[in-house]
């Protein structure tokens, strides 16, 4: 999703963490954020409320020499997702650039679960030693509660640069896109005999589903099959048996079988075989007759 530089909102009712020093690391390292107290979370839970992050600010203040090089990558992860899909937003900026990072959440979370958001950083392509206390991070959180979740208008991440020698051309940031959705039809025994006879409202019959009825359309098997085959060329392979899907032996297996079934000989071995065979023929068929003795 597109992100752009924008004015950050003013701080109001923010929960602030301490401005702590962090060691330089090439691996993802967690930045500790201060969340609402256990008592506040318990009160919200009693009210059966859910919670979201209205606004998150990450302040970065570097403390490295002026000839230090490298890039800092900051990531926000949502631990409700699988590890390979948990990344929500990320920023990349120069190691010597003092900057504020702004993030706006687009979802609620239940207080019955642990707070899912985690903040990490790492440094790449740098000439500064690892484990050097290279910068200070400070987090500010503004959270809100609601009786139930609602759709939240998307707000792109933003940055505010405090170092004059850097500009928006030196930083980059991104946000995850909306997840894709493809409707799955419900299978039933009546699907094979369903058909629409004319334009008019779709009426569900026993054993039908709205998805299956609304995607069948007018009976035109050629048009439907061409469109479906173009969109999903392998959609019905699961109906074939395993023997039909078996491609047979691989090239390596076929080559191995040929190698095992073929006798290979060198030129010297072949010459020796011919010489031995000829010699055996001469010995067996060309011996002179034995002279008869006179009695």
Swiss-Prot record:
Coiled-coil stretches noted in the UniProt entry, renumbered to this chain: none
Keyword Nucleotidyltransferase applies: no
Pfam families (UniProt xref): Gemini_BL1
Topology with respect to the bilayer: Peripheral membrane protein
GO cellular component: host cell endoplasmic reticulum membrane; host cell plasma membrane; membrane
Function field: Transports viral genome to neighboring plant cells directly through plasmosdesmata, without any budding. The movement protein allows efficient cell to cell propagation, by bypassing the host cell wall barrier. Begomovirus genome is shuttled out of nucleus by Nuclear shuttle protein (NSP) and the movement protein transports the DNA-NSP complex to cell plasmodesmata and facilitates further movement across the cell wall.
Protein name (database record): Movement protein BC1
Native species: Cabbage leaf curl virus (isolate Jamaica)
């Amino acid at each position: 999703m597109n992100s752009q530089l924008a004015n950050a909102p003013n701080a109001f009712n923010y929960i602030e963490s301490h401005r702590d020093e962090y060691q330089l690391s090439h691996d993802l390292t967690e930045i500790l954020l201060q969340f609402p107290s256990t008592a506040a979370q318990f009160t919200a839970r009693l009210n059966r409320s859910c919670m979201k992050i209205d606004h998150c600010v990450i302040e970065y203040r570097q403390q490295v020499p002026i000839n230090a090089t490298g890039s800092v990558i900051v990531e926000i992860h949502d631990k409700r997702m699988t590890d390979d899909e948990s990344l929500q937003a990320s920023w990349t900026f120069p190691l010597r650039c003092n900057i504020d990072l702004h993030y706006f959440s687009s979802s609620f979370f239940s207080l019955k679960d642990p707070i899912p958001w985690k903040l990490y950083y790492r440094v790449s392509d740098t000439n500064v030693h690892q484990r050097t206390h290279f910068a200070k991070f400070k987090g500010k959180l503004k959270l809100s509660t609601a009786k139930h979740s609602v759709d939240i208008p998307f707000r792109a991440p933003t940055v505010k640069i405090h170092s004059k020698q850097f500009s928006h051309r030196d930083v980059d940031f991104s946000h995850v896109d909306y997840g894709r959705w493809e409707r799955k039809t419900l299978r039933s025994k009546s699907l094979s005999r369903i058909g629409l006879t004319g334009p008019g409202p779709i009426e569900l019959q026993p054993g039908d589903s709205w998805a299956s009825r609304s995607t069948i359309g007018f009976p035109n098997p050629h048009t439907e099959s061409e469109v479906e085959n173009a969109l999903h060329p392998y959609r019905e392979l699961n109906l074939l048996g395993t023997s039909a899907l078996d491609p047979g032996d691989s090239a390596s297996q076929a080559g191995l079988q040929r190698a095992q079934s073929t006798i290979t000989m060198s030129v010297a071995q072949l010459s020796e075989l011919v010489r031995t065979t000829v010699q055996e023929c001469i010995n067996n068929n060309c011996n002179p007759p034995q002279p008869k003795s006179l009695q």
